[in-house]
């Protein structure tokens, strides 16, 4: 047996800012490295009371992030400071 099985799961911490609010509120979330980032996106959207299905996560530089990867991968590639954009205000009829 590997010693890793009994060790606590490593966590990563994200500071997620809601860009649609002029006050730029933010939430700090600590999640296991192996957590699917889609779950992090869904939880952050619920915390800000915006629809998760129409929200996106971007970096502070404006680069879109594909949420179909682990939280650990996102952290390593993009860092801890991210932005949540509710896309319900984009486009429309």
From Swiss-Prot:
Q: Name one GO cellular component term.
A: cytoplasm
Give all cystine bridges in this chain.
Answer: none
Q: Which residues form the propeptide?
A: 92-93
Record-linked Gene3D superfamilies: Phosphatidylinositol 3-kinase Catalytic Subunit, Chain A, domain 1
Q: How does it assemble?
A: Interacts with odr-8; leading to deufmylation.
Per the entry, what this protein does is: Ubiquitin-like modifier which can be covalently attached via an isopeptide bond to substrate proteins as a monomer or a lysine-linked polymer. The so-called ufmylation requires the ufm-1-activating E1 enzyme uba-5, the ufm-1-conjugating E2 enzyme ufc-1, and probably the ufm-1-ligase E3 enzyme ufl-1.
Protein's recorded name: Ubiquitin-fold modifier 1
């Amino acid at each position: 047996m590997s010693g890793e099985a009994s060790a606590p799961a490593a966590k990563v911490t994200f500071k997620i800012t809601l860009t649609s609010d002029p006050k730029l509120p933010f939430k700090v979330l600590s999640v296991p490295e192996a957590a699917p980032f889609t779950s992090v996106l869904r939880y952050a959207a619920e915390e800000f009371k915006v629809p998760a299905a129409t929200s996106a996560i971007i970096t502070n530089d404006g680069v879109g992030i594909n949420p179909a990867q682990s939280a650990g991968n996102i952290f390593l590639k993009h860092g801890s400071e991210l932005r949540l954009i509710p896309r319900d205000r984009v486009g429309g009829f």
